[in-house]
Amino acid sequence: MKKIIVIGSGFAGISAASFMARAGWDVTVLEKHAMAGGRARKFEEQGFSFDMGPSWYWMPDVFERYFNSFGKSVGDYYKLRRLDPSYRVWWPGEPMDIPAGYDQLKALFESLEKGAAGKLDEFLKEAAYKYDVGINKLVQKPGRSLTEFIDTDLAKGLLKLDVFTSMKKHVGKFFTDPRLRQLMEFPVLFLGALPEKIPALYSLMNYADIKLGTWYPDAGMHEVVRGMQHLAEELGVRFEFNKDVQQLEIENGTIKKVWVKEQGENESLSAYTADVVIGAADYHFIETKLLPAAYRSYNELYWEKRVMAPSCLIYYVGINKKLNNILHHNLFFDTDFEEHGKEIYQTKTWPVDPLFYVCATSVTDDSVAPAGHENLFFLVPIAAGLEGDTETLRDEYFEKLLIRFEKQTGEQIKNSIVFKRSYAVSDFVDDYNAFKGNAYGLANTLTQTAILKPSLKSKKVKNLFFTGQLTVPGPGVPPSLISGEVVAREIVKEFKN
């Protein structure tokens, strides 16, 4: 039986491990931390349970298809509920709830702009086509050769995919009300560029948002990780935790040993052997820190020229009261959307008056906070690579967010805070070896799509492959599941003999 080692147990790592086990390989996952999940880990403190990273469950069909691939379903591992309203947007003057029901949403659009209900139908008809082609075809490509894209259906539909039109221009064709425009542009904010730089192909995200809905796995997003880990273990995958990979030892262009430090008191070094290694940790870290220079596919200049999706400034907050005026997901769009976008992607500076997001899972789920309490997750998108990430700076931002949160919601929480922990650029570097402290990976710009992304196979090491948000298909939880499947498919194809 061929042996494979997967470095890292985020969504992509567990996915790749599971597909390799299904193909009959002996699979070991080496994880630096004490639990699986990568950015989707969780922690518990004072009776509060916090998801550390992803908080939006979109594209439920991708998760269902993943479990179906192994003869299972989502319901075998965790329970989902659809949120209605999907989320609340706080404009400068008033909040707006985004209903899950399509007819109600159309009525909302029409109330803001005459004719917008019909325009939404047209917009989503196009977005549905993009979603179908994007999820079923484009993201399934390994991005190793242009010939992969010689596909009659793709060629016929190239214009309909709007690859060469910007998201901003595309949205502007349908809607004039600034609130509607902002609402339709917001899902691409985390893809790594301003709406004027992101291809309108990604209006497929609006289809995911509006038609497929916003869901919540009971007990939080880490339940998805637990479910995937459970399935992987049923398939025979072994998970080894507190194993920090230090070096990949190469002989004649092949990895012969994976050197690992045991986290803990002894911190002893041990060697693992495998026929193939999958890097599901940070691509840049594996290339520049684990490989000898002669075996790196990309130099530092290459990485410096990459456009990164954002990092984040996060606060995990527990309060000793219940709130009446917030939903599960809350988007605070009470400041200048475009200015904040420029601070993330153009000037790359600490934002002056940023948009922010608050997730309150305890509004939906009593199990994540003590009785009579709320757990709040504040998130500010910021540029990757920012310096000066000090406790003082974090405290200053938190004070700003608190003032705006209290003003908009009419809820006083400052004196009710019983727990607070912050997380930012330096933590992403320390915990995940994240290049420039990125949170979401490589930006999905046109010049960083498909074959223009870092390759899922090393160009210089015969048995080293990659998966995750710095390679195909790109950032986000559903794409990470697909990334694991795509790399496994390539390995099985290459090593079938």
Short names for language-model regions:
Residues 204-255, 259-262:
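Helical element adjacent to the flavin cofactor pocket in flavoenzyme catalytic cores
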Residues 54, 469-491:
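A conserved FAD-binding loop/helix module that cradles the flavin
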Residues 320-426:
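C-terminal segments that line or cap access tunnels to active or ligand-binding sites in enzymes
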Residues 92-198:
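Rossmann-like flavin
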Residues 2-132:
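N-terminal glycine-rich phosphate/pyrophosphate-binding loop and immediately adjacent elements
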Residues 246-369:
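Mid-domain catalytic core of redox enzymes
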Residues 177-191, 353-357, 411-473:
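A glycine-rich dinucleotide-binding beta-alpha-beta segment and adjacent secondary-structure elements
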Residues 250, 493-497:
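Active-site-proximal substrate-binding core of FAD-dependent oxidoreductases
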